[in-house]
Amino acid sequence: MTLITRRSFALSALATTTLSACGNGIGGSGSAVIDSRVDSTLNFMYNSYPGTRDLANNASGMLVMPVVTEAGLGLGGSFGRGALRIGSSTVDYYSATSGSAGFQIGAQQFSTVLFFMTQEALTDFRRSNGWAAGADIEYALQDRGETLRAETTTSLAPVIAVVFAQAGFRAGATIEGTKYARIIP
């Protein structure tokens, strides 16, 4: 009889611990933290790359990932959380995840902003269960003092990605193959 009581107690304790770890996140401060980081990231981007302000003004919406952490040693992956902004309002929160295999070593962090230049691209993104970044993205890069211009890049692709603020020791940053999924922070 004592064995059953101990077993029941152990199972009850395990079940209670497991259930207490399953919070739904509603009422937490996760969204406020993400919004604060998104605001800081946008201010940094606008000050460092003034041409991105034109992109933002012409975009139907922007997905801002303030910090994406990428690491690998043979197998690699990345993760970040951010917000979808339409105008100056946050409408949804998203996570970005990716995985890779091959010769790789190192870790880095970077910020990324996806500019949805057409309403159709924004609608497709919002309606998908999990949107994967692929060949339909145009990367806007700033090399040799050139400025980013919305007029020249808008016609190239419906989604424009800007990757900036890289820190770490891994060669290059890419969002290709990254899956974006809606979250409740």
Regions found by a protein language model. Name each.
Residues G23-P185:
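Small-residue-enriched, tightly packed secondary-structure blocks
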Residues M1-A21:
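N-terminal secretory signal peptides and thylakoid transit peptides that target proteins
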